Structures are given as C-alpha cells and as structure tokens.
A protein has these predicted regions:
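Structural recognition of an alpha-helix C-terminal capping motif at a helix-to-coil junction
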Residues: 39-46, 59-71
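DNA-recognition helix of helix-turn-helix
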Residues: 70, 74, 116, 120, ...
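Sigma70-family region 2
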Residues: 5-6, 32, 43-60, 79-81
Length: 180
C-alpha cells in the first residue's frame, strides 16, 4: 500500500489479488448477494485509491481496508433502507468445508441446525451480525476489529460476547419453537 500511497496506483492490482476474495466473502456474508458483493469489492478498491493518502503505514493495512469495507457496506444499507442482511449461505459453506463427510442422519441434523443458525443470524441486529462476521467468519483480531469499528478493544470484546449470547438465545428459541 505504501507504493500506491506514493503514487504508483498500478500496484493496487497486487492488493486486489491478495485481498479481493476475503472482501468478497465479507460482503456476501453481510448482504447475501454475490453481485452486490462484487460491486462493493470494486467500490472498496476505488475508495482505497481515492483515500490512499489517509493510510497510515504505522497501522494495520487490513484494518484500514476493512474500515473502508465497513463504510461502503453502511453506505449501501443507508441507501437501501430496510434491506435484510444475513450470513446463512456463508455459514453453511463454512460448515461444509470444516466437516468431514457425515452419514445421512447426521447430515440432516447438521443441515437443520445450519438453517436454524441462519434464521437466528437473520434476526440479530446488524451491529451484532457484523461483529460476528468480522470476529468469527473473517477471523479478524480484536485489535483489527477495533480499528474497523473505531472503538476500544475492550468494547469489541464486550460486543462479541453480547453478540454470541444473543445468537445463542435466538438459536435456542428457534429450536424450542421448532420442537413445539
């Protein structure tokens, strides 16, 4: 990014190659729309060029990039007002990759739990959903999340804890609802 900041804007292609997949997954998990995710990834790289002078080499590039992504996502949501954002497709894909080949009964139970988890994630407020996406699905460190969200690390820890608790409660409520 230092070269881009110094005026060698062609170097953005290297950054794109390194980071576009992670940004794409982030946006798909937030908006569940692959075409929109592609558009937002492009927007992030255009913003990186536009605001390249604001990058501080002493800080984390990844945190700066996700701060731009966070802002692009917020701008989109503000324009759309009322758009529901969820991450069940991403959750299902991640679980499939993480698991070994289960038997048919285990696969059915897992699929059912993933569907409930997706519904629970849909019901979470956007701020809680986003902090879970960043911490659990993008596997960002608390320090990086704090930079993205412009808050203290301790605040991030509390928000992650509260988001996980809220997700657990919603999931358990949906399980009870399904059982009755």
């Amino acid at each position: 990014m230092n070269e881009v900041r110094a005026g060698q804007v062609g170097q953005i292609a290297i950054l794109f190659e390194r980071h576009h997949r992670a940004l794409f997954r982030y946006f798909v998990s937030m908006h569940r729309d692959r075409e929109l995710a592609e558009d937002l990834v492009q927007d992030v790289f255009f913003r990186m060029l536009r605001y390249r002078s604001s990058f501080d080499p002493a800080q984390s590039f990844v945190a700066w990039m996700y701060q731009i992504a966070h802002n692009a996502s917020l701008d989109y949501v503000r324009k759309q007002r009322g758009t529901v954002v969820d991450i069940d497709e991403f959750t299902e894909r991640r679980a499939e990759l993480a698991s070994s080949a289960p038997g048919p009964e285990e696969a059915a139970v897992r699929k059912e739990h993933l569907a409930l988890l997706g519904r629970a994630l849909d019901l979470l407020p956007e701020d809680k959903r986003e902090i879970l996406v960043l911490s659990r699905f993008q596997e960002m460190k608390y320090e990086e999340i704090a930079a993205v969200l412009r808050c203290e690390v301790a605040t991030v820890k509390v928000r992650v804890y509260r988001a996980v608790r809220a997700l657990e409660q919603l999931f358990q409520g949906l399980e009870k609802e399904k059982a009755s």
